[in-house]
């Protein structure tokens, strides 16, 4: 990749990816990811099990419970929402990362396969994510989970969902989370900050239309309004749990992640901001063995261990 930007040498081989341009291409990609993930998860058995939970509209949401060896109960838990521009199923590396969080932070991971746009626009997927948190609380005894040590987390679109869930948990149900793990989160659907234009040509999503992604997620033009929790930077962030916010230097979402971190700080929230020097969006998924990814994973796990206590 030729670029005047000082992208980390270990990330310069990352190629540009194009989101599927129509429903048939999207369906084909989803089927491929499902098949690859099914094969990939086999190596994790019996540490990963599948179940379903009921969302607010009675939809059955698949979730994966990752329980590391010798985990003591009651254990802390991370409820995790994967990225994928609100339209894509998780990548195999999402499960690899989730397994590392479970093993190295000594926690249960509840990995949520929420509903995706465009078939299911907001708030379907968001409600699925919130239902997973409520389910973890309601089934804590069976799961062996300590309800006082719950963290929500996610990357990219999943970071948006985690931030929105954290807001809703406190504002509507006074659920006191232990933390928020927000990895290059998409927290501002207006998408007008300088990094969007500055890094639009940087892989992996070279030339991606952030407005199109946002409107696909919403199911209508941005001009028609943005519902509560869909764009977390517009929400009330006071009294929220401590947050880890990760913003790669050359990510088009960099500025909104930093702005969200500052909003949290301004409201008195404990924030650990990790601006990944030389990083690009999704670097940990696309270059998992790079030193950049290893350093970021270490920071995330250290944050989890700290807030779990």
Task: Annotate each PLM feature.
Residues 222-277:
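Serine-hydrolase catalytic core
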Residues 74-83:
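Short beta-strand element of the alpha/beta-hydrolase
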Residues 1-68, 309:
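A glycine/proline-hinged amphipathic helix-loop "lid/cap" segment
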Residues 63, 79, 101, 122-189, ...:
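Short strand-loop-helix active-site module centered on a catalytic nucleophile
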Residues 290-309:
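Catalytic active-site module of serine/aspartate enzymes centered on a nucleophile-bearing elbow/loop
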Residues 92-111:
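Short amphipathic alpha-helix adjacent to the substrate-entry channel of hydrolases
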Residues 167-225, 239:
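Hydrolase active-site cap/lid region
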Residues 279-292:
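Catalytic histidine-centered segment of alpha/beta-hydrolase-like enzymes
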């Amino acid at each position: 990749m030729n670029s005047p930007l000082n992208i980390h040498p270990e990330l310069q081989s990352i190629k540009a990816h194009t989101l599927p341009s129509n429903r048939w291409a999207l369906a084909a990609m989803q089927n491929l990811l499902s098949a690859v993930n099914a094969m990939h998860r086999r190596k994790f058995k019996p540490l990963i099990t599948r179940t379903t939970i009921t969302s607010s509209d009675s939809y059955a949401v698949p979730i994966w419970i990752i329980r590391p060896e010798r985990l003591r109960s009651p254990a802390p838990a991370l409820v995790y929402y994967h990225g994928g521009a609100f339209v894509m199923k998780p990548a195999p590396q999402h499960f690899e990362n989730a397994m590392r969080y479970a093993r190295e932070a000594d926690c249960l991971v509840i990995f949520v396969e929420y509903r995706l746009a465009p078939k299911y626009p907001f708030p379907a997927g968001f409600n699925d994510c919130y239902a997973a948190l409520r389910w973890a609380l309601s089934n804590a005894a069976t799961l062996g989970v300590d309800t006082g040590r719950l963290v929500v987390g996610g990357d990219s679109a999943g970071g948006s969902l985690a931030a929105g869930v954290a807001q809703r948990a406190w504002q509507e149900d006074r659920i006191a989370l232990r933390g928020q793990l927000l990895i290059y989160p998409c927290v501002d659907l207006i998408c007008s900050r300088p990094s969007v234009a500055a890094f639009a040509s940087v892989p992996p999503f070279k030339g991606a239309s952030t407005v199109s992604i946002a409107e696909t997620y919403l199911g209508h033009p941005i001009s028609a309004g943005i519902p509560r929790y869909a764009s977390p930077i517009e929400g009330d962030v006071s009294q929220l749990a401590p947050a880890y916010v990760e913003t790669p230097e050359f990510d088009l979402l960099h500025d909104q992640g930093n702005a969200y971190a500052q909003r949290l700080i301004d409201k008195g929230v404990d924030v650990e901001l990790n601006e990944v020097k030389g990083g690009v969006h999704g670097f940990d998924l696309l270059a998992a063995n790079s030193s950049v990814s290893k350093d970021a994973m270490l920071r995330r796990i250290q944050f989890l261990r700290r807030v779990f206590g």
